[in-house]
Amino acid sequence: MDIGMVVTLEEALLLKSMELNLEATIWSATPTDHRSLMPKPRYKTTNWKQYNKALINRGSLTFWIDEEAFAEWNQNKQGKRGRPRRFSDLAITTALMVKRVFSMPLRALQGFIDSVFKLANIPLVCPHYTCISRRAKEVEISFKTKTRGAIQHLAIDATGLKVYGEGEWKVKKHGTDGKRRVWRKLHIAVDTSTHEIIAAELSLSNVTDAEVFPNLLKQTHRKIIEISGDGAYDTRDCHDAIRVKRAVPLIPPREGAAFWEQGHPRNLAVGCQKLYGSNKKWKMRYGYHKRSISETAMYRVKQLLGGKLSLRNYNAQVGETYAMIKALNKLTGLGMPETQYIV
């Protein structure tokens, strides 16, 4: 078959092997009816008792304002000249996490945390709401977990967080001109095995996904086996960044994509697309479906912590977003459902 370019012998053998192996699979059904012949997969949660306990603990105040926060609430040393700040970065981070988890404006947040300290007979006070707003612009928030070792599959994607604008109902009924709707774009990299967010970055809405991709990979020094993303990441810069990490790229080439230089890992996906007319069989062969874990993570961010940013300053929005990511990783650490396929 003429696929537009002479590929290496190794690539040709791989393509032929894929062709022979996949012809005997479920794709033997006609393209118009194979989906209807496949029943919807069913899964059973095997650790429901532990997961149910984790869901209950999500609302525990002592989980969010813990002993570490009590001990390091006030800042003792600043590391530079001048009077030290009264509240530590951990205090500001904790306040921002509580704000997102319990969906509170800043003033209500201050009263809420003060009441917690009062009920617990702890001689601490919450930072003033203006202090939280100001410190959010420069607070150092580390959302990385203590998990170590190689990452088998890292899934990368992006979603939008609304700053302000018309509600969805008004847009549905009357439409919008888009002038008063402001968004920020959240880029995340998720470990598909643990559901932990390994890297994250907030950008303006006009920044493309591919522009942020290399910066996400620079945020972790752990070894990565596979890195997946959608077609928006099918660029030279993204593939070069993956090559630096010595990982396997799982990025579907765009429709009508051309081969790159001889021996490039992307050529196998391009050849498969030209051979079968689409990327479907390539996705099945190499487990591209794992990328959906990144979409699950974005859904969890919006469902559990809200899809709208309340702080108006961009730098403060970055701090608020990183507090959301840290909170989500804490929720993930409590426990996730373990499922088993039911035949």
Functional labels for PLM-detected ranges:
Residues 120-123, 330:
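Short arginine-rich
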Residues 31, 36-41, 231-303:
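Helix-centered, glycine/charged polyanion-binding patches within enzymatic domains
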Residues 48-50, 159, 251:
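Short polar catalytic/cofactor-binding loops
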Residues 77-93, 101-107, 111, 115, ...:
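Polybasic low-complexity intrinsically disordered regions
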Residues 5-6, 11, 315, 325:
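Short, low-complexity, intrinsically disordered N-terminal modules
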Residues 39, 89-93, 97-101, 279-343:
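Basic, amphipathic alpha-helical segments enriched in Lys/Arg and hydrophobic/aromatic residues
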Residues 2, 8, 12-81, 86, ...:
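Charged, often Cys/His-bearing segments associated with DNA-binding zinc-finger transcription factors
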